[in-house]
């Protein structure tokens, strides 16, 4: 094929983008404004005047709300405005002119504010010139906070600073008017009081009514006032000021009909309304020229726009009419009903104004009814809660049917249709397990695969294969449709009219075909390239070259600038004068006179067959137009016919074999074949709810004959899926770019490690763990036959078990395709042709292989496989202080060297979610593909081994032995005795209360702890006494299911049931159940169950167990909604954050939120160690040493070992090289150095003497740590490589990942607060409620706790006991100082004393209690009296000082208090009030700190001599008042913490608040065992505080975080409020965020959208010129390998028969000719070879 005919490859002399943007025009920003009446009239197509829907059904009434000029709502007919059908016409707006103006329903509060700050006489904002200097910043920077401050100051003005008129304040009034209150408001109030006092004087009532009526501001007056506001006052009204120097000559259209108002005035029936209307008309006619002129920008908000004089009528397609089933009529949309009511009441209002005979009150009532109907149309409700007036004919007025109601909420347009959309090419069905599939594969039912298609573009390399698919048709594998694009272009006579002759000019047609084929979008043919410059240039070039056939040249730049590049109407000479037939703006240069008599139209219509060409009258003309979707369109200019030559999409479902053969023969490159979903195609697999990014991942398809989606159960964890009826979704991507990105970014093997905590999210589960655990046991041996059989289970060489036997039904090419993938980087199956079989572990008396050897073969794979696993770690049951290691009796210490499993049983710790996992090691060192391969092998072998070995659970497995029952009795008896002892102490009063708790609370907490320990002890018995073959014990030990507690509940005892963290409450008439006595504290009466599931439960035990289960079910049901809303708020606030190329975290406005992600910029996925070091240096060094030693032994080399000094010197030399110093920072170098000095070098000192006496190779086997120069070099290289990859990549959406990392585990947290054992019996709010408090930024939290650290001087020589005693003494003292003490706590008595002379209250202090509290000398009578006199509430009763005589001190322990008043009527009431108030008066401590509890904790003390942890004490203070606590002497303020975030921010600053948020979220997660990386939590804290104050993730905080993102705020909550505020403030949305990009359909600026990918040109090395891109010599396409020779032959045939119809051959003929050519070529090559062979024969000597 010639170079200019290769249409697939993009060529250019300069670097070009790899992907050509199909939509070069994008929405860059959105400007919001309130549409004025003038702009609305310009946009309107028709004036709606009649409320009648149909003149003659089904013909809509002219000028009605269903007028056809508004567009179409059904599929029949054409639009009367644009002439298009329903698919192409987007609808047109109309208008309704109101008889009287109304307030805008969404802006009525803003109108009220404007009228309050604008003087009604001079229309100036009531802010003086001097005060305006303070707000001068509004002229160049608009600030809503400054605007509100200025408005508040304007409302306080008594007189207008410009005209000195009295000031007014507008408030709500009845109906839709505004009540203006002036300075005579007090007089009106007095008149009203006089009226009531004189039994409703009629004259005064009328006078009052007249006074109040004169000051009611209706929309007419408001419009008059706001129209005269100068532009310099706009910023104070909340409207940004803009330069308005260019004015139009038009007058303002925002006025009422003056004729109607004049007629109303002449009739004189409504005096008030007439006077108002006439005054408005007179003043309106006298408005200055400046106020009547409009700006050139029609979409700038003005103050008078808050008053409506015209309302828009939406297009008919937005409010379609539904035909009734019987055909008798239609059911109209709610918007249509609202519009009809508005027109009806509008006509009635006009009649009332014209006639003049209607009373004024009725006119006002109709006016209010018009306001109500307009409000229902806009916002679906009536402001102020006013009920609408229902007519007799109305069936009822429904709320929630307005325009705003269609936008807001979950079912609104923003959330239901714009942010999330329903898609095609998707499927959904039930899921089922298949352990023989790779973790990258999902089995798709054949029925689904036949319905899902992919648009495959035909090329010279896949044409043969696609022809075979076309021949199959609907038979799988086949195709459903074919788009013969080339025939549409080649044989279209319209191209001939442009001078493109098929037989004469092939080059020009090739250009046209290349041009249009680039524009066609393969997955949506209705969306073509918009205004491509090269398309316009190509059309100009084609037209200019064919000037003989066309008289004029079309130039895109000659079109008017404001005219769209698309003429929507059909130009008809017979109807040239009608505006409804042609756009008046069509330029004459668009008309191209053609000489031919038959005209055609080339358009686009996907999914329909081509229409025939219709011959037209010779007098018709054709207009060539460029439409907005950049297709080549020839519009027929005849009024009689309108024919279109559409894209030829042919369906194969109804074609027979002959028809499909014809279509296959006509297939050419650039055609599109919609083929079936084939094996190995890329899919997206999803399960809802999608709580994190791993809920939707990329899989490869495998086709099977079943009806479910099948996949490997190891991938269940990220989906949180099980196989009890769950359904999942698939999405079949339709673009090559999307498939490529999904494979790299969303592949399931790429998501083995979760970004939430950096641990494995995908691993072996349940039966797989059980099978591997049993197989790796010490007692598993097998013969060579069994050994090879198990190896073959995992090392599947042919893929039969993986892909299914039914795959052979699809032909050998698919099998060949699968085989060709083996060994490639994308091969996640990991076929093994030649496994690495090892020698038997037992040779005599019989050769036997162990199960560990089978696992070793699975880990090794092929001989050429470079995967070497080196792990050494203890299991969870291995004691950390043990030194037995490989000699552990329980076989729970794992050693794997060079992929040889030597010691230990594999459990969940090494096969699932852990950083000690085998798969985690593989991902970090060898990549995710190797981990996926080995995971599949383990899953296959575990499933087959378990089937052969047998693993069942029966009743005998949970049957306790007599020994176990005996030990149970002993443990239960001991627990009962301890409980009874505590109960007796409680009943006798000997039980002491824990500080901060009552005696009863202390008893319940103690008993709960004692009885819970009983079950724990029984669980330990189960682990020790059960046989090692016990099935529940095996499942518990390997981690597949269950725990020791579950085993104890099945076999031994259920134990204490928990109800919200405590025992069962006595909420059934002072007892838990009717089976027990009232107030019983016995264990069984409080939910302790002595029986097990094996023995069965007693009735009261069954009730307790069911009650505890119900408590958990309710908690789970309630937390679902709370956590779902919590995650939605988190995602909305964090979705815009991403990592920039300077490694800062920025939002969509490019504001810096963090200078480094998580303060260090590291990716949690690549961090191997949680804290301190970034990598597991021990494992890395051991791995390198083992690899080098095995390599040395294989090569026969002798390593030179280093002693300590040589190793240290070598390390210093290597670290100082530039190779390591450029990338590795000083912190990492110091970690490596300290690691060597502490862990490696001491061992070298003690072991290197062996190397002097033994051969080095033998010494290497004995030494515990061997080290060579190569080892150190390789180790540093690996550290450097890992460190370079450690940073989070630029473009990463770190915000969304952080939100999901916190939101997803919150679904597993509890809703209730519980007793925290480590916090000294204080009930701390935890779980979801605490998390909501933190992220919401709540000011008043439920349990504010301040952790007060004490400052104690400790000498180095002091003993631990002395240090502990000092801390305890200091804690008691500080507790008494800080904790608030009330008068009632230290009073012996508070007595009322009545005598003839005086009545008072006598208070006696209990000095013993004061001394016991340690407050002797701090609390005295004088301090108590001073506290009473300084109390705000007591001041009103006893005065402010002692001189008043209300307080008298009688002794050191007694004083009296009496009220100031001596009135008989008030004295008794004041005495009782004072008696209730006195006990609650604080007399010592901090009043806001209700209590302080001493907390004990362990810590290493540097000042003490002992190295053991010391017992220390601190205070937990409940309440607020951090600043007051820090002022107390003796407090260590550097370590004192508070969980009240807002208080910390106000006291210590915003950075302290950031640290507090991070610590609190971390503590909340850790208390529930939820692992979340600290970097995500820090990002949450920074986004809450990066504005300088704490902003919660609420609708209010989000508004302050992203005030300019109108679309995002509207899609979250309060849709109408945000849209109205944005329109009034002329806000500009830059539309750079994620939500805005999704709604507007443009790429977001993160991920792959954060950069542009360029393709460099190819240069000839000799000439230096650019050359065409050449594909690879061999191309794999679903198993069909095409060599270069075949490509050249196909290209030769295509070149010879591509354009010439006479030489066109069918597929069979072309194949025959190809075979003949091959035979001739073989003959020629054979003859040449024979001649050459003859020439090479040796001559005779």
Swiss-Prot record:
Mg(2+) binds at residues 722, 724, 726. Zn(2+) 1 binds at residues 79, 82, 89, 92. InterPro entries: DNA-dir_RpoC_beta_prime, RNA_pol_asu, RNA_pol_N, RNA_pol_Rpb1_1, RNA_pol_Rpb1_3, RNA_pol_Rpb1_3_sf, RNA_pol_Rpb1_4, RNA_pol_Rpb1_5. It is found in: Nucleus. It is an enzyme of class 2 (transferase). It catalyses: RNA(n) + a ribonucleoside 5'-triphosphate = RNA(n+1) + diphosphate. Residues 1099-1111 are annotated as: Bridging helix. It holds the Pfam family RNA_pol_Rpb1_4. Coiled coil: none annotated. Its EC number is 2.7.7.6. Its main location: nucleus. One of its GO terms (biological process) is DNA-templated transcription. SMART domains: RPOLA_N (SM00663). GO terms for molecular function: DNA binding; DNA-directed RNA polymerase activity; metal ion binding. Zn(2+) 2 binds at residues 119, 122, 160. GO terms for cellular component: DNA-directed RNA polymerase complex; mitochondrion; nucleus; plastid. SUPFAM superfamilies: beta and beta-prime subunits of DNA dependent RNA-polymerase (SSF64484). Belongs to the RNA polymerase beta' chain family. This is DNA-directed RNA polymerase III subunit RPC1. The lineage of its organism: Eukaryota, Metamonada, Diplomonadida, Hexamitidae, Giardiinae. The gene is RPOA3.
